[in-house]
Amino acid sequence: MSTTTYYQGNPTLTVDGSPAVRCPDELLERYRAVLDQQRMSWTEHLHLARLLGSGGQGVVFLSQRRGTDEFTLPVALKIFSPARYESMRNYDEAMGRIAQVAARVAQIQQDNLLDVHNFVDRHRIRIMEMEWVDGYDLQRLLTRQLLERTRSRVSAKRWEYLNRVIVTDGPAQPRLKPGIAIAITRECLSALAALHRESIVHGDVKPSNIMLKRTGNAKIVDIGSAFELTNLPKPRTCTPTYAAPEVLEGNDCTPRSDLAGLGYVLIEMLAGLQPFAGLGTYRELLEAKRELPRRLPEILPREVVCNELLMNFCRGLIAPDPMCRFPNAEAADMLKEGAASFQRQLIKGDLAAEYENEIRLWLEELD
C-alpha cells in the first residue's frame, strides 16, 4: 500500500489572499526538470573512519554519508571477507542470499531491528550499508570496567539506586536486575517476532549482537548470519556458545533456535556469568545446554530463583527440546508464562521502573 503522496494543490497564500512567495522562473524550471527526468543519480564517497568490530564474516567500519549543504549522516559499513569461501562462485552465491535477506529486513522497519540502507560491491567485494547505532552492545556493557566507570562518576546515593534497580556486580561480570533484563529481552523478542513473521531466522543471537541505544532501547544488529527458511545456507555458521542444542547437533536452525540463543543471553544478564564459560568442545556444550534448565537454581541469584514466573519463562526459552520451548517469539512475550506477565507482576508489586529512561540515564553516565 502506497503511503507517500505527491500534492498538486493550490499554492500557499498569505492572510490577505496573495501568494506567499514568488519563486524565480529559472528555479522552478530546474525543479520541474528534476521531476520530469524520473530518475536520479549521484556519486557517493564513504570514508572508513573507525573500525567498529570484526568477526568471521568481515569487518564493520564507521563512516559518513555526505550530502549537500553540509549534511552528514553516520552509517556503518560491513565489508564481507571472502576468506572463508573456496571460490568466487561460492562467495557470490552466499552474498546473493545475504542481499536477499538484507532487502527484506530493510522493508520490515521494526524499531528493534537494524535498519539496512544498501548492499553494494566494490571490485566484487560486497558491502552492506547500515544505520550506525550509537550506544553499547551487551558484551561490552556487562564488563567490570564499565561498572567501575559508572561507580566513579555517580554519587553514593545514585550508586545505591543503580545497584538496587539497574545493575550490580555478579560472580564473573556485572548482572542486570530482573526488571531491566526482561525489558531488554522483550524488545529483542519484538525484533525476532518481526523477522520470524517474514520467515527469516537471525541465526546468531548473542550479547555482541544486541545494542542498547542512547535512547534506552534495545536493537538486534548484524544480520549477516540471517537466512530465509526457504533458502537455507550451506554450510551454516553459528557462535557455538549461544547456539541451540539442535544447531550444534547439525539439525536445522529455526525460529525456536533464536529463542534459545536469546534465553542464554537472558540467563547471562541475570546471573552475572556466562553459563558455558570454559567449555571448548561441541560435546561439552551440548551436555551443558541439556543440563542448564536443571542448573538454573544454582547459577541464578535468589531474587530470580524465588520467582516462579521468571524461572518458568527462562526454561521456556532454553528447553533443550525445541518443541518444549515457546512456540514463537510473540508467545514468549505475550502468553501467560511470558515476559509481559512478569512486567505486569512488577507493576502490581510497585517494583517497576521506567526502564527505557533508566537505561538512557545509565548510558549517559558512562560518557
Language-model-detected regions and their locations in the chain:
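Terminal C-lobe "cap" of eukaryotic-type protein kinase domains
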Residues: P320-C324, E330-Q345
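Activation-segment/catalytic-loop signature of the eukaryotic protein kinase fold
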Residues: F119
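Regulatory extensions appended to serine/threonine kinase catalytic cores
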Residues: Q343-D367
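Activation segment signature within eukaryotic-like protein kinase domains
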Residues: I184-T185
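Catalytic-loop of the protein kinase fold
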Residues: H196-S208, L212
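Conserved short submotifs of the Hanks-type protein kinase catalytic core
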Residues: H123-D137, L141
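AlphaC helix of the eukaryotic protein kinase fold
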Residues: M88-Q107
